[in-house]
Amino acid sequence: MEGLLLFSPAPYVRTNLVGLVPFASLFFEWLRTPEEAGGGTTAFRYRTLPMTGLVAYCDTMDHAEEALEKPYRKPVLTVLSEFDSIVDTERMLEAADESFLNPRSRTIWYGDETPETKVMKVISLPSHLEKEHIRSFSHLSVNFSPENPHYGRGARAEWCRPENDPRPRFYCEIPESEIWYGAWGEERDGHVYVRLTYNPHFERQTEEVLAFLRGK
C-alpha cells in the first residue's frame, strides 16, 4: 500500500451516544426496524438500521482512532465537508494534521472558511452555492457526479423526503425552483432543504485525486 484516499472518514462523529451502542445492542436488534422505517426506502436510500451494523461501525471507529494516534508517513488525501451532519470533520482534520506526516498529504475541504492547519495542505472549495440553491455538503454528496443517474441533478425523487417527516408528497411536489440542498433535510430560513447527494465540484475533485495519485 502506497498511501490512502479517505472520503468522509468517520472515526469521529457529532454525538456522544456512540459509546452506548454495544450496551444497547444487548437489548435491541434494530435502531429502526423495517416496519418503523415506513416509506421512503429505495434501492439507493436505506432507512432501516440493525444494531449489529452499528456495533461493527463502532468497532471500526475504535481501531481508526487508535491508528490516528500514531504517525502515518505515507501520503494521504482526505475529503471532508465542514457542515457534515454526522462526521466531526473539524476533529478529523485536526487528527490528520497531527498524524499524516507525508508532505504530499492534503485535504479537500468543502465549507465557508478555510481551516487553519499546522502542516496539512488544504484545498478549500465553497459549499454555499447560491445559484444552485446549495447551502452545504453532506458526507454522501462528495462521492457523486452531478451526472450520476441515481444521485445527481434531477434525481430528487429518490431523496425528496426529509428524515422522519410524515409528509413525503409535500416535499416531492415542491417545484424544483423552490428547493434548496444541504447536509440534511429540514425547513429553516424560509427554505425547504433536502439532502445534497451530488458534488458540484466533482470534476475539480477528480483532477485533484488524479494529481495526487500521479505523485504531484
How does the language model describe each region?
Residues 24-39, 45-50:
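A structural motif
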Residues 45-190, 194-214:
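Serine-hydrolase catalytic core
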Residues 9-11, 22, 50, 75:
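Short, proline-centered helix/strand-breaking motifs
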Residues 16-20, 90-91:
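Short aromatic-enriched loop/helix-cap "lid" or pocket-rim segments at secondary-structure transitions
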Residues 20-27, 140, 209:
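Generic structural signal of hydrophobic/aromatic residues within well-ordered alpha-helices
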Residues 5-17, 25, 31-32:
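Active-site nucleophile loop of the alpha/beta-hydrolase fold
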